[in-house]
């Protein structure tokens, strides 16, 4: 894609995303975010503003207790000191991939999803300048990779699989990019983003 086309593509993506933002959740008090019965988390969907824009993804370290070795966006559970779920996503991104919160231009958020580990996860979409160096925290991240945004947002990349677990039917989505296998919550988040900006 030429630089002109990719510049237009990113502009169109931003316009479509902001025109179709999900309705906000009911207003929650700060304490409600951290109640024992309402486990909340957030991830950052970092869009790197290269001539050909990309999505930044991580592969989680193999020694982690949950979701070891899986492809994921930087993110994690909300802390009591976080002012909002946007703050959660930005803090976690800085901890995991060294993207300073101050450089991220937040476009908005997607509707929250429930994870298999019992968290209510809110994806936050943010633009990151291409000249910002980023790298993985060795304690949490085994590697980083980028997917061209126009490829990530192609709905044909995502294949559904119906599974039955603990008496409940679940539909999960699978996708591949080069040698990276993307599935579960991460694939679902990207697919939701693609659906939101598609015409």
Curated annotation (Swiss-Prot):
Gene Ontology BP term (one): nucleoside diphosphate metabolic process
Keywords, ordered alphabetically: Hydrolase, Magnesium, Manganese, Metal-binding
Spans through the membrane: none
Motif placement: Nudix box: 76-98
Enzymatic class: hydrolase
GO molecular function (one): coenzyme A diphosphatase activity
Pfam family, one: NUDIX
Cofactor: Mn(2+); Mg(2+)
InterPro entries: CoAse, NUDIX_hydrolase-like_dom_sf, NUDIX_hydrolase_dom, NUDIX_hydrolase_NudL_CS, Nudix_NudL
Residue intervals of the Nudix hydrolase domain: 38-169
EC number: 3.6.1.-
Keyword Hydrolase appears in the UniProt entry: yes
Residues annotated to bind Mg(2+): 92, 96
Entry's family note: Belongs to the Nudix hydrolase family. PCD1 subfamily.
PANTHER family: MITOCHONDRIAL COENZYME A DIPHOSPHATASE NUDT8 (PTHR12992:SF11), NUDIX HYDROLASE (PTHR12992)
Function: Probably mediates the hydrolysis of some nucleoside diphosphate derivatives.
UniProt protein name: Uncharacterized Nudix hydrolase NudL
Organism annotation: Yersinia pestis
């Amino acid at each position: 894609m030429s630089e002109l086309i990719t510049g237009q593509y990113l502009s169109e993506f931003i316009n479509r995303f902001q025109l179709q933002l999900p309705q906000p959740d009911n207003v929650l008090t700060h304490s409600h975010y951290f109640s024992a019965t309402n486990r909340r988390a957030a991830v950052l969907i970092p869009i790197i503003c290269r001539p050909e824009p990309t999505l930044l993804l991580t592969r989680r370290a193999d020694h982690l207790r949950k979701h070891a070795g899986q492809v994921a966006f930087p993110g994690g559970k909300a802390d009591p000191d976080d002012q909002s779920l946007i703050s959660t996503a930005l803090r976690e991104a800085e901890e995991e991939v060294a993207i300073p919160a101050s450089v991220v231009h937040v476009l908005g958020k997607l509707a929250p999803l429930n994870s298999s580990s019992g968290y209510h996860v809110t994806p936050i979409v943010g633009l990151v300048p291409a000249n910002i160096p980023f790298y993985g925290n060795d304690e949490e991240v085994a590697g980083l990779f980028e997917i061209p945004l126009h490829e990530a947002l192609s709905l044909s990349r995502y294949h559904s699989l119906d599974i039955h677990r603990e008496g409940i039917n679940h539909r999960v989505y699978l996708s591949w990019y080069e040698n990276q296998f993307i599935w579960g919550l991460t694939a679902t988040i990207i697919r939701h983003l693609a659906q939101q900006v598609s015409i």
